[in-house]
Regions:
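Catalytic-site signature of metal-activated, phosphate-bearing donor transferases
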Residues: 56-62, 69-73, 80-243
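Short, well-formed alpha-helical segments that are part of the catalytic scaffolds
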Residues: 1-20
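A conserved acidic beta->alpha catalytic loop
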Residues: 16, 20, 28-37, 51, ...
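A generic local structural motif
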Residues: 10-14, 32, 56-59
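Acidic helix N-cap motif at the loop->helix transition within catalytic regions
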Residues: 9-11, 33-42, 82-83
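Hydrophobic/aromatic residues located in beta-strands of well-ordered beta-sheets
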Residues: 23-26, 149
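Conserved donor nucleotide-binding strand/loop of the catalytic core
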Residues: 22, 36-64
Length: 243
């Protein structure tokens, strides 16, 4: 786990896995809220870093893990009781798959989302020696060095969008980091990317992927994704101009 001012859901997140974890490895990127005291309450000594890069920090956490099986968890995620039971069962087995794909149950302002790109699965549980971390600052993920994986049915509960202020702050950070990543790769922005991509993002999530079925309470979320696209490519355009 990587933390940085993550006190809002950190206690619930760690509590959800403490009974199945032989060790909990946390890299903290300079928290100034209650994060460190919460970690201390679980007798967790985080690895301190000044680097605010999710991919590199998660790679550091993975390198410090010693168990055969690793679960990658974010501080706004809570492992469901049914997934806990599944993991306990897996740990008792002698023959394991190299990786396990886990479904996510995403929430916006406390309400469950079922459509519009919010009903997906991710690799989060794997043999330690069979995975590495995608080294990017945004949307980092586990990468399995094998084709031997299994889909699980029990979910991780994800509370990424808790308030509008928190959500738009996260999207702003993501967009600026993503623009930097794209700039480093030599990508050029364009009028089409700045104008059309945000509109397409909004339409794809709300209409094409049937986000409207969740109810129009999710409208600020889909507008937020459009905003993130706009900010990414407009920031990239500014970086291109400064060359």
């Amino acid at each position: 786990m990587v933390t940085r001012n993550a006190d809002e859901l950190l206690f619930q997140s760690i509590k959800s896995v403490k009974d199945i974890a032989d060790e909990i490895v946390v890299v903290d990127a300079g928290s100034t809220d209650r994060t460190l005291s919460i970690l201390k309450s679980f007798n967790i000594n985080p690895i301190a870093t000044r680097l605010n890069h999710l991919g590199k920090n998660k790679s550091k956490a993975l390198s410090r893990a010693t168990g055969d099986l690793v679960l990658a968890l974010d501080s706004d995620e809570i492992v469901s009781p049914s997934l806990i039971r599944t993991i306990k069962s897996l740990k008792r087995r002698k023959i394991l798959a190299d990786g396990y794909i886990i479904p996510f149950r995403n929430h916006f302002l406390g309400r469950r989302l079922r459509y519009g790109g919010e009903n997906y699965r991710m690799l989060r549980l794997a043999k330690r020696r069979k995975v590495n971390i995608k080294n990017v600052s945004v949307h980092e993920s586990l990468v399995l060095n094998s084709k031997h994986f299994v889909n699980l049915g029990s979910p991780i509960m994800h509370y990424s969008y808790r308030t509008l202020h928190q959500m738009y702050g996260k999207f702003t950070t993501y967009a600026l980091n993503e623009a930097t990543e794209r700039y480093k790769k030599g990508e050029q922005s364009s009028f089409k990317k700045v104008t059309f991509y945000p509109v397409h993002m909004f339409w794809a999530r709300l209409i094409q992927d049937k986000g409207y079925k969740d109810g129009f309470f999710r409208l600020p979320l889909d507008l937020g994704f459009a905003y993130m696209e706009f900010l990414t490519y407009s920031s990239l355009a500014i970086k291109n101009l400064k060359k």
